[in-house]
């Protein structure tokens, strides 16, 4: 039985997309999806070649956003809705990089999950 070859899903003329930014203390991950939820592209600081503690820096998050912004402008995207999640240091850097690249930000949401006294938090660091 022959397998059907799947073609890469090419979305042209997408005006508005949603950028899901997950910023942890160790890395920054950004996924670009349509408003329906179909993921168009994604990358992270680790995928760009940063290793160790450099992945969690604001500079690495800026580079991630710049790479995706260049690809989005190539697809014809003009407006971005941004969903921020997590406590990392790359949150503000991603938003600033998307604005400076020429993309308009229509909605800026913080979707960080907040527990109502759920699991026990990790112990505090003693340095």
Positions of the model-derived regions?
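Ribosome-associated RNA-binding proteins
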Residues: 1-127
């Amino acid at each position: 039985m022959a397998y059907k070859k799947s073609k890469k899903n090419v979305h042209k003329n997408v005006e508005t997309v949603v950028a899901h930014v997950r910023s942890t203390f160790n890395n920054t991950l950004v996924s670009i999806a349509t408003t329906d939820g179909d993921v168009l592209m994604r990358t992270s600081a680790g995928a760009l070649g940063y290793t160790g503690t450099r992945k969690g820096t604001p500079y690495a998050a800026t580079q991630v956003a710049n790479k995706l912004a260049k690809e989005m402008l190539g697809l014809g995207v003009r407006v971005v809705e941004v969903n921020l999640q997590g406590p990392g240091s790359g949150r503000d850097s991603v938003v600033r990089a998307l604005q400076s690249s020429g993309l308009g930000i229509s909605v800026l949401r913080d979707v960080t999950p907040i527990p109502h006294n759920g699991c026990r938090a990790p112990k505090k660091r003693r340095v």
